[in-house]
Amino acid sequence: MISHYAVHVKNTSLKSTRDKYLKILAKQNKIKGGIPDISNNPNDSESIPNKLKALWETANYAAMMENMDTSIGMVLDQLNSLGLEENTYVFFSSDNGGGSNNAPLQGGKAKMWEAGLRVPMIVAGPGVPENSQCDQPVAQWDYLPTFHALAGSKASLPNDLDGISIKSALEKGNAGKLPSRDSGFVFHFPAHYTVPITAYRKGDFKLMRHLNTGEIKLFNVAKDMSESKDLSNTMPEKVKEMTQKLDAYLGKVGAWSMKEVYETRENELNRWIEIRKQRIIEFKEQLKAKDIENNMRNHLKSQLIKATDEIVRYNKIKDQLAKDRLSDKWF
């Protein structure tokens, strides 16, 4: 398994590739003097106009894409040189949707809208027809049983796996018959740092529930991938059916509620605050010593300031957490 930081961490492109795109964009936008490379000095970006920052982001994104493409090409070339291409399956995918524009899909990374959940999956290997396409929804937890089937393993798998083998879909596309997926696709995301939503897909329909308010949305994502037409008011029976199945699954696996998440986060912040308060007491006691060296005195003073600042920061986070608990935003 190869896990690329591109396109993820901002400064992971090669300088030579990044410079190439900085020059291209500078020429296209008629930027005299070129676009500065701020990757090694992010603090300098404060003095750079927003337009140049945006162009740098574009150049860096393009460079990361090219570097990733080159890296994957090197892996494929090595497989070919070793004569393994006819006996190897290559899966290419992503852990979540993109963090920027994902039109026509809504949302993106860390969101339960389709742009956060739908990712590319490209597969090459024995029995997979070239240039074929399959529209059957699958999930990455299907990989284990799929690899098991592709390898022809006789070893038994646990009975409680969430995933299914998608071998038939890889080989026959939409004509492939997949095993029954009783639980559907459940994406339970009771997060305190973003919009808390549970998404549940069963067949063509996707139900979304806001975990602060309980508000429900329903979409036919097979026909409406942009999730522009909420069907919850016109299909109450479908909402009831899917809600019951979703709640049964969440209860079965012991899924956390938002109340538990918020309380855990608040307790964590309170614990950090108490630790800093205790440190402040200790630092002040140490500073009372008359024989303390100047270097140590300065160090303790800086640590005292740091602990005080951290208490202020954690209290601000608590204030924001209290506001987030009342938020009804979907994005």
Pin down the residues of each PLM region:
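Short, surface-exposed beta-strand/loop micro-motifs that present aromatic residues
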Residues: P196-R209, K217
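Long, internal low-complexity/basic segments
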Residues: P49, Y143, N212-E215, V221, ...
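WW-domain-binding short linear motifs
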Residues: R181-H188
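Acidic, glycine-rich loop-and-strand cores that form catalytic or ligand-binding grooves
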Residues: L161, S168-K177
